[in-house]
Structure formats: C-alpha cells, structure tokens
Amino acid sequence: MTKPTVVLVHGAFADASSWNGVAERLQRDGYSVVAPANPLRGLAGDSAYIASFLKSIQGPIVLVGHSYGGAVISTAAAGNPQVKSLVFVNAFMPDKGEALGALGDRFPGSELAAALKPVPFRNADGTNGTDLYLQAAKFHQAFAADLPAAMAAVMAATQRPIVASAFMDKAAEAAWKTIPSWALVSTRDKAISPALERFEAQRAHAQTIEVDASHAAPVSHPEAVTDLIRQAATGDGSSAQPALAGAGLNTQVLAGLGMLAGGIVLTGCGLIGAARKRREPRR
C-alpha cells in the first residue's frame, strides 16, 4: 500500500523548522514529507497558496496544521479528493463563516495578549498594515513554556510574524465536515485555550488525544504528534469520522473587537482600528 505524503503547515510566530522533529520521525518511517512556508498574510490568501501547493503532489495526502495553520488547512483541503485526512495540532478549526478572533473570544484563556508586539509595515502598493510578533522576553512563557529557555530564545529570534488582519478574516470552508480528522489538545496551552481545542475537536468528530504540553507541541513532543499523524495516515482510529455538513454548532461571529493571533486574544478596538487605517492607501 502506497504511503501518503504528509504535508506539515506551521502557524504564526513559527516557521517550517518547528516541524523538524516530526518530519525526521516520519521520514524514518518511510513517509514523504513536505513542510511548505505558510505566508501568514491573511486566511484567504494563505489557504489559496497551500491549496495550490497541494496540487503539485501526486497520490494521497495527510494534511497537518499547527495553531493558525489549522484554519489554513481546513480551507485549503476543501474540494481536493487527494486529501484523505486532516490533523489539527493545538489548532484553530473554524466553521465556514467563522472568524478566528470571534471564535477565540468564546473560549477565553489565552495569556498571550500582553506578549504581542505590533509592527506597522507598508506594502508596495502604498497600503499599510500591521504585523504581530511575540516579544522575545515573553516568548518562552507564552508560547513554549515546556522547552528550555535557550531553545525558546532561538525560536523567538527566528519567528515569522502574522498580519493582524488575518484574524478578522472569515473562513471560506470547513473541510473537517467532509474529511476524517484527528486532533491534539495540549493541556498546558497558553496560546489557544484547551477548552477551545476540545470544543473544535468534538464539533469535527475528530479522533483526539491530549498531551501535557505547551502550545509548541510539535517541538516539545514530536513523538506524540508523529504518532497521531501515523494514525491519520493508516486510518487507525475508527472513531474519526467527518462531521456532517451543517451539523457543526453555528457560532455567532461576535462584533469583532477581539483579535486572535496564534491563539492570542487581543481585546479592545485600538489595534484593530489602527490596522484598518494602515491598510488605506496614502492620499
């Protein structure tokens, strides 16, 4: 039986190297593994990019997303018959029409709001935006508390930012409704509330495991993550069934003062308003 290709999609405040431990283990098992760069420029564009990348792969695919990457794969996989299973690791799993900021507001518990560092930027077309980083001094405690401080410091230095407006975008699809899904919940996650992760997994009828880990589970617990991917690749876990279309709980999109970046609930309209103003072209 041909083994599927495993595609690993990272989230915010990380890069593809966060999958190194997982990729190494899967390759030893004989899997073909690719970890494309997630642009982190907005949910619609990021999902379209990954969807296009998937078309370059022949044969079955196991598509894996960490954190914000979960929202990306849930849209990118829609309509692609090669994607046989989805794996969500400490991830967002929005329903169609659901924005990540509103979803996060329904399940408070993130401790990362105070760790954000907004950095304005200008696009080539003259429009402006705001990138979100995690402050280096707060990265360890907020994102990767179960890793050595020195390792977390390197991760903080090499993190990739996400555009703030990405977390006001509404998901265009929810592929977990039609594709069997697996999910990993980190019980010590300070980025995305474990309660939110459990809710999403239950809503998606996902085969779920819980790990005593921080938000950086792919780095701190690569064997547990790899084992879950193996289950998804082999179909081991018969209770993993796609959710029926329309069967998911219809959540209200709140009136949008909350913004979530990789699980960060940023309350108040100040930064959102600033981000919107910066997107307007100069006159």
PLM regions with names:
Residues Q82-V83, V87-D125, V163-A166, E200:
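Flexible "cap/lid" loop of the alpha/beta hydrolase fold
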Residues V64-G69, I73:
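Gly/Ala-rich beta-loop-alpha elbow adjacent to hydrolase catalytic centers
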Residues A157-A204, T208-V219:
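Conserved serine/cysteine hydrolase catalytic core
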Residues G262-R283:
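C-terminal membrane-anchoring or membrane-association module
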Residues T2-G59:
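Active-site catalytic motif of lipid deacylating hydrolases and related acyltransferases
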Residues S238-L260:
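Extracellular Ser/Thr-rich, low-complexity/disordered mucin-like segments
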Residues V219-T234:
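Post-His helix in hydrolase/transferase enzymes
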